[in-house]
């Protein structure tokens, strides 16, 4: 299991900003936690404009939607960006997260924090099921 935090780099291109393997710390006997990501303000700030299509998920700043997404085998979702901070967990199958810096293969247990940057998806041979929580950010001006 690992977490990938993706967003826009200093040049405005989408990239992996951080990648870590899960390392659990015991908080109580027999109970351990691994911190994936923290926000510092609510609603989260506006994200830089992307070059891909803006997909409006209809999420008001500070509110969220929570979905399971099933990607058919080989499905390609074109490059796009959203006005959301997304938290995704791969549950079944595999999928490539495609950023301006390349393709990143994700398998069950992998987690992604997508900070509104350009990205695309390409499902593996068995398809993919992911759980996604999308938190609305402040709209871009």
Show where each model-derived region lies:
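Short, surface-exposed charged micro-motifs
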Residues: 4-5, 87, 111, 120
């Amino acid at each position: 299991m690992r977490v990938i935090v993706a967003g826009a780099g200093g040049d405005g291109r989408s990239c992996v900003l951080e990648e870590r393997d899960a390392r659990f710390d015991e908080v109580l006997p027999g109970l351990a936690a691994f911190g994936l990501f923290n926000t510092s303000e609510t609603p989260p700030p506006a994200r830089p404009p992307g070059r891909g299509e803006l997909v409006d998920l209809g999420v008001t700043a500070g509110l969220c939607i929570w979905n399971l997404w099933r990607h058919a085998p080989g499905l390609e979702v074109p490059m796009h960006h959203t006005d959301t901070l997304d938290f995704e967990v791969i549950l079944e199958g595999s999928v490539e997260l495609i950023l301006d810096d390349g393709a990143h293969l994700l398998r069950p247990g992998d987690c992604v924090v997508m900070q509104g940057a350009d990205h695309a998806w390409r499902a593996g041979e068995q398809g993919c099921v992911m759980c996604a929580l999308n938190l609305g950010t402040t709209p871009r001006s």
